[in-house]
């Protein structure tokens, strides 16, 4: 979900909502209602996927007012694994901002991440996503001035920050929106 938002997606879908009974069937005549497809298992109980979707939806709801009014200008790819997967092995196109800079953003440091770069009502919004699917990431965004004002939205919560550098700690696959004021 977060990578889709970084690339500028305006909608997401979860499929299927309810797990069809035939997807729960395992060899030997048993059923797995917990770890298969669907936010709700064929037995009617919530699966682990429900809780991932719930967490993602809280973040989507919090960033919606910004991203829906923004235009994606591209992404910055930072780190060896992300660069290898997206630029070296992938089919990178004009969406890649190869300079690593975008408007006031001068430098990205730390662990592997993708930074979605947005024009938000003529200003700057950045959606930073941890590229690692297994470990937390520490990422810093450095700007050209020490007294910028930002709104940072992470885990569905918003806070205002002032400074020239923003350190972010992101869970695996997690995203945070940084909006310059």
Where are these regions (language model features)?
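Catalytic-core region of carbohydrate-active enzymes that cleave or remodel glycosidic bonds
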Residues: 1-21
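Conserved active-site loop/cleft motifs that coordinate metal ions or position small ligands
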Residues: 12-16, 127-129, 151-153, 178-179
């Amino acid at each position: 979900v977060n990578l889709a938002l970084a690339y500028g997606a305006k909608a997401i879908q979860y499929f299927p909502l309810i797990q069809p009974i035939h997807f729960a069937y395992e060899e030997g005549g048993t059923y797995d209602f917990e770890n298969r497809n669907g936010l709700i298992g064929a037995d009617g109980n919530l699966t682990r996927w429900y809780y991932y979707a719930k967490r993602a939806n809280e973040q989507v709801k919090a960033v919606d007012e910004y991203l829906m009014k923004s235009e994606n200008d591209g992404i910055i790819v930072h780190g060896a694994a992300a660069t290898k997967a997206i630029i070296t092995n992938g089919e990178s196109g004009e969406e890649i901002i190869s300079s690593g800079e975008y408007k006031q953003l001068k430098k990205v440091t730390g662990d592997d991440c993708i930074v979605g770069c947005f024009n938000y009502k003529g200003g700057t919004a950045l959606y930073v996503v941890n590229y690692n699917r297994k470990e937390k990431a520490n990422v810093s965004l450095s700007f050209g001035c020490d007294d910028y004002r930002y709104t940072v939205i992470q885990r569905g919560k918003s806070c205002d920050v002032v400074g020239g550098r923003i350190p972010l700690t992101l869970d695996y696959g997690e995203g945070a929106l940084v909006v310059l004021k």
